Amino acid sequence: MTDRVSRRAVLGSAAGLAVAAGSAGLARGGKPRRPNILWIVSEDNNPFIGAYGDAMAHTPTIDALAKKGLLFRNVYSNAPVCAPSRFGILTGVYPESCAPANQMRAVATLPKEFRTYPELMRAAGYFCTNNAKTDYNCNVNAKAIWDIQGKSAHWRARTATDQPFMAVFNHEATHESR
């Protein structure tokens, strides 16, 4: 997991993902069908799962999902603690670029030109849900950026069954504060 990745490899992977996403799910008649996205978040557990090669870990469900989906092998955290890291994921920028978002229990004012990834996904036609962990260290209203957020949020709540979804499930059992 700590292999160095060149800029060329990152750009090549991004281009490959863009091509794959653009052609994913072509239905009869050539009409593209966008993929559903299930994003599972598990904090503070390191790569101690079978899918990452840990021989001691018994994680058959996660391993099966990893085989069928997309497993990120070269990853890092953009912040050493949870909420600033979520800020980076939410906005796509380093938490330090919008101080004090890089500090725990701080509230940064998000610049007007910033767009969060749920806003972008919704603009692209996705139904977006998040079941927990909406402390982003900034003045974002979680209820405004997600179609549904909260403990009972689920992609099945969408009214159009042909609408693609992006569902974020935050598993809190591994969180350091638990």
Language-model segments: residues:
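Formylglycine-dependent sulfatase
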Residues: 2-178
